[in-house]
């Protein structure tokens, strides 16, 4: 039996481990935190459970790409999801003109809902949606299609910046901003983020949006169960402290518990720049290390987790996005004295969700430079001035939510806040980046980090290799597994099992 040790038990590590274990590998996952899951992790405060990430997911409709991967793994019937409202999958509020836009489900719902506000743009919206879907057709992996093209050809749209792609099809400046509202989900930056990434994320949510019910950790548990059912283990509280490399070959890894692990293959599911700190300098060519260390990281976030008073605030079955000004939609990655430029507000669903919400979440993009003065501190030891700063930022967000929902603050019972430092220290991501390496249409290969490395039995996985998020990371896990098992091997297996 072939063996694999996976460094990091986040979404990428667990999906890769589950796939390899299903294909006969004995898998050991080493995770530094008390629970596995990365962005699927929860924490407990005030007697309730809060999700740290993966609040809104796509690709889980019947026949969707992540649905099919879960079916292949044998867990789809155990995933607990709640679909958001069909007539309003998301709502967008722009403070600038006090306008709210509700986005309908599906291609027609999207076009119809926005045509109500911009009737003269209906034909352009149709062309835009067709162009979005057309771009996804250029990415075979997104559709789980086997491909023999190592260097596939692409359209001119594929190589545009996302904002330029939108402007090519949409004339009205306000509507351009509206259709770009999801760009924080991929770390969007104006004149930088590639159009194809915007298209992939947008098309996911066109097809239906879901939420985990009762906590996203239940999904992490399902992936762990696949690994364990096939003879593998997921060891928490056991981060890797050293990767022993000789002659471009990993001999073993050593954990914080002093244990040494050998395997046929080693897979790193942590940020590549973090991996470098665990290895000898000569493990990789200097040019490779320099290149990866020079790639900018996407921005981070500041989040507020709220316990609500009983029967005080209604459960809202869709996400609400708040924006200050239309022309700020692409500026989340730029320094601004006007923070927050925007945020996501939602009420996560509980099992047997009733009329009223028990908790709420506010999360707003934030740059790591906003917390740079505390970068050398650790969790729980950042000082009084840091706590004061967090309180101020929290109040800024609460004041904005009051604009959406007058009287909301009176419904709040208790509050906990997390900054980019929290994300950095718990997720192990450089600068608390939410979406890994930034992607730039002007130099797409720079941030397309291959899963294979110059170390012959070390392979990478996770959001830094290709696409971020709940869709991108599982797709990269397929690439990682196929680097071992052979091109298209997993895709053929998925299609065999799911093409019914």
Predicted region positions:
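Active-site-proximal substrate-binding core of FAD-dependent oxidoreductases
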Residues: 486-500
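Mid-domain catalytic core of redox enzymes
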Residues: 211, 241-355
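Helical element adjacent to the flavin cofactor pocket in flavoenzyme catalytic cores
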Residues: 199-250
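A glycine-rich dinucleotide-binding beta-alpha-beta segment and adjacent secondary-structure elements
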Residues: 174-186, 403-467
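N-terminal glycine-rich phosphate/pyrophosphate-binding loop and immediately adjacent elements
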Residues: 2-127
């Amino acid at each position: 039996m072939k063996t694999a040790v996976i460094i990091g038990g986040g979404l990428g590590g667990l999906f890769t481990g589950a796939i390899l274990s299903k294909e006969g590998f004995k898998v050991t996952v080493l995770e530094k935190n008390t629970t596995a899951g990365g962005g699927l992790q929860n924490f407990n405060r005030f007697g309730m459970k809060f999700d740290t990430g993966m609040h809104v997911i796509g690709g889980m409709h019947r026949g969707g790409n992540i649905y099919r991967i879960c079916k292949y793994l044998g867990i789809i019937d155990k995933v607990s999801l709640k679909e958001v409202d069909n007539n309003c999958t998301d709502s967008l509020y722009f403070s600038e003109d006090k306008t709210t836009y509700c986005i309908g489900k599906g291609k027609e719902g999207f076009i119809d809902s926005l045509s109500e506000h911009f009737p003269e743009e209906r034909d352009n919206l149709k062309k835009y949606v067709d162009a979005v879907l057309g771009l996804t057709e250029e990415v075979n992996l997104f559709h789980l299609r086997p491909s023999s093209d190592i260097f596939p050809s692409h359209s001119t749209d594929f190589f545009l910046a996302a904002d330029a792609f939108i402007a090519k099809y949409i004339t009205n400046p306000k509507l351009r901003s509206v259709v770009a509202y999801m760009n924080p989900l991929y770390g969007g930056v104006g004149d930088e983020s590639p159009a194809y990434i915007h298209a992939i994320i947008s098309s996911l949510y066109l097809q239906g949006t879901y939420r985990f019910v009762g906590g996203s950790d239940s999904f992490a548990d399902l992936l762990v169960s696949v690994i364990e059912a096939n003879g593998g283990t997921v060891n928490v509280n056991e981060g890797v402290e050293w990767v022993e490399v000789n002659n471009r070959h990993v001999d073993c890894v050593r954990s914080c518990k002093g244990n040494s692990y050998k395997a046929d293959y080693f897979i790193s599911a942590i940020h590549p720049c973090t991996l470098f700190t665990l290895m000898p300098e000569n493990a990789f060519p200097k040019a490779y290390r320099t290149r990866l260390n020079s790639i900018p990281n996407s921005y981070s976030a500041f989040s507020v987790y709220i316990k609500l008073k009983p029967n005080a605030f209604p459960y809202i079955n869709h996400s609400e996005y708040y924006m200050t000004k239309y022309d700020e939609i692409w500026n989340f990655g730029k320094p601004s004295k006007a923070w927050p430029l925007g945020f996501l507000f939602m009420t996560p669903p509980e099992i047997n969700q009733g009329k009223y919400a028990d908790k709420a979440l506010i999360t707003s993009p934030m740059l790591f430079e906003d917390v740079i003065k505390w970068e050398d501190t650790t969790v729980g030891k950042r000082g009084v001035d840091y706590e004061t700063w967090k309180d101020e930022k929290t109040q800024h967000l609460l004041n904005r939510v009051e604009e959406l929902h007058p009287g909301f603050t009176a419904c709040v019972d208790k509050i906990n806040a997390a900054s980019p430092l929290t994300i950095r220290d718990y997720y192990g991501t450089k600068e608390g980046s939410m979406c890994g390496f930034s992607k730039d249409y002007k130099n797409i290969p720079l941030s397309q980090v291959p899963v294979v490395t110059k170390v012959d039995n070390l392979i990478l996985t996770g959001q830094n290799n290709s696409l971020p998020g709940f869709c991108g990371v599982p797709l990269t896990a397929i690439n990682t597994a196929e680097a071992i098992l052979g091109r298209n091997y997993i895709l053929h297996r998925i299609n065999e099992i799911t093409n019914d």
